[in-house]
Amino acid sequence: MTAAITQLKMLFKPQWRKALIAAAVAAGFAPVMAQETFKVGIVSFLSGQAAESFGVPAINGAKVLIDSFNKGQAPAPYNKVGFGGMKIEPIYVDENGGATKQVQEMRALYDRDKVDAVVGYVGSGDCLAVAPVAEEMKKFLILYDCGTPRIFEDGKYSYVFRTAAHAAMDNVSLARYLKAKNIKVESINMINQDYAWGQDSKKDFTLAMDQIYKGAKVEADLLPKFGAGQYGTEISALLSKPADILHSSLWGGDLQAFILQAGARGLFQKQQAVFSAADHVLPGLGEKMPNGVILGARGAYGLMSPKSALNDWWFDLYQKANNVYPVQAPYRMAQALMGLKLAAEKAMAANGGKKPTPEQLAAALKGSSWQSPAGTITMALGDGQQAIQDSAIGRTRWDAAKKMVMIDDIMRFPAECVNPPANMKTEDWLKAGFPGAKC
């Protein structure tokens, strides 16, 4: 016993402690790794109309991916344990409740829970509210989903990033798809939610169509409130104004409700539905989803995702854990967490293996590029803090044998074909006729 105690004392002598630390560093592990975790606040809708088809799948994606990271079971270059050896400790927060509540919740994550980063926010109004607050606090924030281009076109940030493309991509892709498929468009009906996402989507689609289908006329232009749920009046208005296509950026429970109510009244037999962000409702709606709907997924996600070893691994990981395939929300969450992981490890490689500061994380993520299950993510816009990526558009078809909605006639568009260049705002780019687009 005495000999054992003597050996323990020897380990804690200064020279032995230094030797152990040096050995740890030489082996590629910094001392921080033994005692520290990396805390991440993860925010998405866990209740309300956006939870079932969007928020909960996003959180489910975060859970399976973080578990794989912490076990060191993800494929390279994501195969290091946790973030550079630090175990990832997630704190999940419900996004429901409005922008003011989300600002309070985010402050609590940073101040009370001492998170090292926040990854979150689906609602464009929420993103517009939290981004300047995180910047003021000098805290690291990744916006993983929200679509409004205004974040980086109307503001300048050092600590705020968005690791997915904004809404311009979705609507330019739809317009290009319609033209490529020789779909007649002389008249357009529109229904979009009356807040930043819906307003921006409506504007971007209209401006894109002005270039590709010159002379096409907008008939009905409807803006129901977010979370309306009942669309009888709007459906009557749409039926009263015949049009070649019906454009919508509705999403979540709003989109599900609209499809069920409009389908029952035969709207989709009379007007070609063109939905910018609809893939996430396919598993829930099943055979109630109309055939032939043209839709996007806000990226090359889910049934429109590219073939790759990384995507095969991710698709299988999510599907086995949740008994359903991943749609856009978990894909966007995955690319955010993968970008954060690589940024953290890049920063640690430069700082001697210590937990990175917000400034070090920002420097590592700014202007970077990485492979995700959906393809390459490049921080090309917003002074290196706004991502661009490839997109995909297709048509729905119910497969009775598989008992699921399939997507056929898929077209993929390169990131630089459907996103504005770094030196132009979205509206200016659309009005100028897509200068610099590489298709």
Residue spans of the language-model regions?
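Bacterial N-terminal signal peptides that target proteins for export
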Residues: 2-20
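Signal peptide-proximal N-terminal region
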Residues: 59-90, 210-216
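Extracytoplasmic ligand/sensor domains, especially the bilobed periplasmic-binding protein
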Residues: 60, 100, 115-222, 270-296
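Short, well-structured alpha-helical segments in soluble
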Residues: 91-116, 180, 230-242
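Extracellular/periplasmic periplasmic-binding protein-like sensory domains
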Residues: 262-335, 345-351, 406-437
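Solvent-exposed, acidic/polar segments of extracytosolic/periplasmic ligand-binding ectodomains
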Residues: 369-439
